[in-house]
Structures are given as structure tokens and as C-alpha cells.
A protein has these predicted regions:
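Charged, often Cys/His-bearing segments associated with DNA-binding zinc-finger transcription factors
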Residues: 1-36, 177, 186, 190, ...
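Basic, low-complexity intrinsically disordered segments
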Residues: 2-11, 15, 27-137, 152
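Secondary-structure capping and boundary motifs in well-ordered enzyme cores
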Residues: 22, 26, 53-61, 72, ...
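Acidic, metal-coordinating catalytic cores used for nucleic-acid/nucleotide bond scission
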Residues: 53-57, 271-279, 298-300
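Polybasic low-complexity intrinsically disordered regions
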Residues: 82-85, 95-288, 361, 367
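Phosphate-backbone recognition surface of nucleic-acid-processing proteins
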Residues: 91-109, 292-294, 300-315
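Short alpha-helix plus adjacent loop in nuclease-associated cores
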Residues: 112-116, 315-320
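Basic, amphipathic alpha-helical segments enriched in Lys/Arg and hydrophobic/aromatic residues
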Residues: 279, 288, 316-377
Length: 377
């Protein structure tokens, strides 16, 4: 017999959201790991809020919602709240009952200064990695480092001269800069035809900490920041991260800072690509008791800072091979999580957002590793 469609929905539901989520759903493990770390952050959250006044949206719920945004690659906080309103899975993950109202998207804006700071996100990552079931997954000896460009939330049209003067008039029509106005007229805002832009002469008015940087010769320069990660080589988990201004030495300087912060008394190795093959960087690593497993840059006229005493060992080849896995971290963060184009301004805010996405990546990676262990057990 043909069934009839019910046009009027029921007024009540007697099935909880907990029962609707499959027991094998990966978000269950993600939420459990995130809740453990957030519970240990409770003393820090208490210091961020005054004792009196109206109750706020719990900071744990806001951070869980932002983790969802990264995991599912939701483009904006407004779309996140829209999906949080009708998606029972998202409501369950954040801790909202089916009848609870969702908060306004501007809640994230008003709490950004409070919750999205680098120290808090770094502590979140540290507490996640210190969980009892996560510690056995980490290597304390072998690591890899790399950096990636993050497109700043600022366009070329926001560039202005640092000295406050006007740029020279544009070239005449038909010459260099074909199609422009006649010579002698004032240059329109954002018109840089015939000019050589540099970080020494121009600065963005939208984000004065962003810097012009190009990935390779022949590629256009964009206002960017640079994200850095240190990955342990056993299972590809990120153990340290930060964001810096995009400069020629930023990758090596950040790598050295993060390498010094690695804990443990064991002798450590640090794998890196050819861009880190400089005598100064290699010497600094050795001074800090870290064996540099940097890919040899032998295609240039200068000699490599890594000689045969390091390159001859089998461990060096293993580190060079394992180092490539860090590209998967950046690929997920920029492509799947949507951080190729930043939606925050200022190095500190960008650093907090980047670290939050690193936490999201680690949560997914740890969940997959623990599930594989359960299958093999």
C-alpha cells in the first residue's frame, strides 16, 4: 500500500540527540578529546570573565563551534550559526539541546579578543597532546618543520606609501602600462602600473602587519603571513606551530624557536627542505643539541651545509622521506579547512586562528589513529 506523506510535523520528539548520533561516528571521539582538553582549560576561562553580570555563552561551546567550522570547512561564522540551528549533529557536538536557541553570529566577534589569542590556543594544543591516550602516539626524538604562505585579508588596493607621499603619476597611454590615463594626472587609488612595490616603500592600511611575499620567481607577490609547524615523524601530529610575518628568514627563525621549545632529554633530529640549508641555521640547531636532517641544496653554486657525516646515515634518508608528510597538514588546513584566504587581521589574531586549525587537524588525525588501533586490537 502506498504511504501518505505527513504534512504536519510532530510537536514533540522523544528521542534524544545522543541516541541519534551513531556510536561509531568519528565526531564522538573528536568531542571526547576536545572536552578533555577544554575541561583542563577551565581555570584559564574563569580568569577571562568577570564574576558578576549576565551569564555568557560558554567559551567551551564557542570553541567547539569554531572547531566544527574548521573540520567541515564552513566559509563563515554566519553560515556556521545557520547550520548549528538545524543540524542535530552540530547541536550535539557543541552541547546544545534541540530546543536551545543558537547565539547570534556577532557573539564570535565580541569574544574574539577574549578567546582567540595565541597563548590560549597554544595551551589548547598542549593539553590535547598531553592526554594519556595521545602521548604514546608521539615521538620524542624525530621531528620535521616547514612553513606555508597564508593569504592576508588585505588587497593590493590597500597599499599606501609609508612616507605618506603620493606615488608618481601613471605612465602615458600606449607606453608602459598600456591603457592608462595621460601622463601627469594623479594616480588613482590601487593603480600601481609602472611602480615597483616593496615592503620598504608601501604598507597595507587594512593590515599593517601583512607583507608582500611571493612563493617563487615569476609568481605574483601577495600580502601574506607565514604559518609554521613542527611535526613529529611517528604519526604526523603537529606538536608546535606559530605565525610570523612573511620575510625571507621567517621560516628558519620560527623553526629555531619551535625547535628550542621541544621537550624531552633525548637527542632530537629535525627534518626540513632545501630552504633551510644554510650554515647559520644548521649551526644553531647543533648548538641547541638538535641533529639537522635538512635536505641538501646542491643545485646552487654554493655548497650544502649538510656534509657526508650526516647524509650517509640511514636515519637521514628516513627523515627526508618523513618530512614530506608535513605538506598534508598544510594541504588540509588551507584546502579542506579553508584557511588559504585568512579572515582575520593582525599577526596575533592570525596566529590564534592558525593554531585552532592545527588543533582541528590533530583531533581528526588522532581519531583516525585510535580507531585504527581498535581495529587491530
Amino acid at each position: 500500500m502506498r504511504g501518505q506523506q505527513e504534512r504536519t510535523g510532530p510537536l514533540f520528539s522523544y528521542i534524544s540527540t545522543e541516541e541519534r548520533i551513531p556510536a561509531s561516528h568519528p565526531l564522538r571521539q573528536v568531542r571526547r578529546l576536545a572536552d578533555q582538553a577544554l575541561d583542563r582549560l577551565n581555570p584559564t576561562f574563569c580568569k577571562l570573565y568577570p564574576e558578576g553580570g549576565r551569564p555568557s555563552i560558554p567559551p567551551e561551546q564557542q570553541l567547539l563551534a569554531l572547531l566544527l567550522q574548521a573540520i567541515y570547512g564552513i566559509r563563515s561564522e554566519r553560515m556556521l550559526i545557520e547550520q548549528l540551528d538545524y543540524n542535530l549533529l552540530f547541536r550535539w557536538f557543541v552541547g546544545l539541546n534541540p530546543d536551545d536557541p543558537v547565539w547570534h553570529p556577532t557573539t564570535f566577534t565580541k569574544n574574539r579578543d577574549r578567546l582567540l589569542n595565541e597563548e590560549l590556543m597554544a595551551k589548547f594544543l598542549e593539553l590535547l597532546l598531553s592526554a594519556p591516550e595521545v602521548k604514546p602516539l608521539l615521538s620524542s626524538e624525530h621531528f620535521s618543520v616547514d612553513g606555508t604562505l597564508l593569504r592576508a585579508w588585505a588587497s593590493h588596493s590597500s597599499l599606501e606609501r609609508i612616507d605618506g607621499l603620493d606615488d608618481d603619476p601613471p605612465p602615458p597611454s600606449g607606453g608602459r602600462g598600456f591603457g592608462g590615463s595621460s601622463s601627469g594626472t594623479k594616480r588613482a587609488k590601487g593603480d600601481f602600473r609602472g611602480l615597483l612595490l616593496s615592503n620598504q616603500t608601501h604598507r597595507s592600511t587594512s593590515d599593517d602587519e601583512a607583507r608582500l611575499f611571493k612563493k617563487a620567481p615569476g609568481v605574483g607577490a601577495f600580502l601574506s603571513f607565514m604559518g609554521h609547524c613542527v611535526m613529529e615523524n611517528r604519526n604526523g601530529l603537529v606538536v608546535a606551530s606559530e605565525v610570523s610575518q612573511a620575510t625571507g628568514k621567517a621560516e628558519r627563525d620560527a623553526a629555531l624557536r619551535m625547535a628550542r621549545s621541544l621537550r624531552g632529554a633525548h637527542q632530537k633530529t629535525l627534518g626540513a627542505d632545501k630552504g633551510y640549508d644554510t650554515r647559520e641555521f644548521v649551526a644553531d640547531l647543533r648548538i641547541n643539541g638538535i641533529t639537522p636532517h635538512v635536505a641538501q641544496n646542491i643545485q646552487t653554486r654554493r655548497s650544502s651545509a649538510i656534509d657526508g657525516r650526516t647524509a650517509r646515515h640511514q636515519g637521514y634518508a628516513q627523515s627526508i622521506n618523513a618530512r614530506k608528510r608535513i605538506e598534508q597538514v598544510f594541504g588540509w588546513i588551507k584546502q579542506s579547512a579553508g584557511l588559504r584566504q585568512l579572515k582575520a587581521r593582525g599577526r596575533s589574531k592570525v596566529g590564534a586562528v592558525f593554531r585552532l586549525h592545527v588543533v582541528a587537524y590533530n583531533l581528526i588525525r588522532i581519531t583516525n589513529l585510535l580507531r585504527a588501533q581498535e581495529v587491530m586490537a
